[in-house]
């Protein structure tokens, strides 16, 4: 038993990694696709950028991402043409918005761009999502009004982006 363990330990490759070489891929620009009501609710208790900045400072993290909010497909494509985004957060409203259609089109055009669903908890959205193809999304999150969830989403996607390297 001990011999087998020694053999397995020899097979492992350990290397020193400098701290500066960890987390080389980061999220700097986030595109938030939401209807005006959901965007307002998200910012109900303060600007997203300010809250994220304060949360990053409290956690001793550097380089908080910038958020760009869009409401329509036209605004989405204009921003995607002019800015390099690292993450797209889609907030499908309870109305018949085309958020999922926009997300599908983004994934076709930018297949490596991570897409996340952030949805308020409601029965109508739950029923709607049951009929949607969610495979294009990295994750689906239920938002209950706490913007701290955005920091967690960003850190989760960054960890996933750096998994192979770190």
Predicted regions and their residues:
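Structural beta-sheet core signal
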Residues: 32, 116-117
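General small-molecule cofactor/ligand-binding pocket signal
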Residues: 67-70, 140-141
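Non-catalytic signal-transmission and effector/linker regions of two-component phosphorelay proteins
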Residues: 1-66, 146-166
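Glycine-rich, phosphate-binding/catalytic loops in enzymes
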Residues: 48-49, 104-107, 133-134
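Conserved phosphotransfer microenvironments
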Residues: 41-44, 64, 71-77, 85-112, ...
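P-loop/Walker A phosphate-binding loop and immediately adjacent motor/lid segment at beta-alpha junctions
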Residues: 107-115, 159, 165-166
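Alpha4 helix (beta4-alpha4-beta5 surface) of REC/receiver domains from two-component response regulators
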Residues: 97, 101, 117-152
């Amino acid at each position: 038993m001990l011999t087998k363990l020694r053999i397995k330990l020899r097979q492992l490759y350990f290397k020193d990694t400098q701290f500066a070489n960890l987390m080389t891929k980061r999220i700097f620009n986030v595109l938030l696709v939401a209807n005006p009501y959901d965007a307002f609710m998200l910012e109900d208790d303060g600007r997203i950028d300010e809250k994220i900045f304060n949360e990053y400072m409290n956690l001793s993290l550097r380089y908080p991402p910038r958020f760009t909010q869009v409401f329509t497909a036209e605004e989405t494509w204009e921003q995607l043409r002019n800015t390099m985004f690292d993450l797209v957060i889609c907030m499908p409203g309870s109305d018949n918005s085309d958020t999922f259609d926009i997300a599908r089109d983004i994934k076709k055009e930018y297949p490596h761009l991570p897409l996340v669903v952030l949805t308020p908890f409601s029965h109508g959205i739950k029923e709607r999502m049951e009929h949607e193809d969610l495979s294009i999304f990295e994750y689906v999150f239920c938002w209950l009004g706490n913007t701290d969830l955005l920091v967690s989403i960003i850190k989760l996607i960054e960890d996933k982006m750096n998994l192979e390297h770190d």
